[in-house]
């Protein structure tokens, strides 16, 4: 599960970087407007993808966050969405009921409202990110209806990170 979250985080990071940061950086470096259309696609996007893909392969080969134990030792603060299921499973039954109610009722209703409200805007602005967002929405709704509470929390982790990333643009 940790590797899956890392993969989606880097996928979103690559898409956002290529769509927003690359034209700005090229404008600063070249001092002119750089088009991101079809004629310039290979010259603008591919070098960034290649370099970041090499970084991703290097991080994976170093064994970055392969298990929850390593995540707890290495990056405890950054791994809060990953550690949430462990916190829930060690809680008292009364606290589990409260957290379950909050995750299923409050967080999912807020997330589904924002997804429906901003969907047309995101389709126009970030079509690739919208596709990934629809996938995360399916995972969250599927996990909370049929899975356990820890599955719900695991599904909400990358979904919340993705939604915050979308709103920050």
Curated annotation (Swiss-Prot):
Instruction: List the GO cellular component terms.
Output: mitochondrion
Record bears the keyword Mitochondrion: yes
The record's section on Pfam families has: CcmF_C (PF16327)
* Major subcellular location class: mitochondrion
The yes or no answer to whether the keyword NAD is present is no
Q: Which UniProt keywords apply?
A: Mitochondrion
Cellular localisation: Mitochondrion
Which protein is depicted? Answer: Uncharacterized mitochondrial protein ymf3
- Give the species this sequence originates from: Marchantia polymorpha
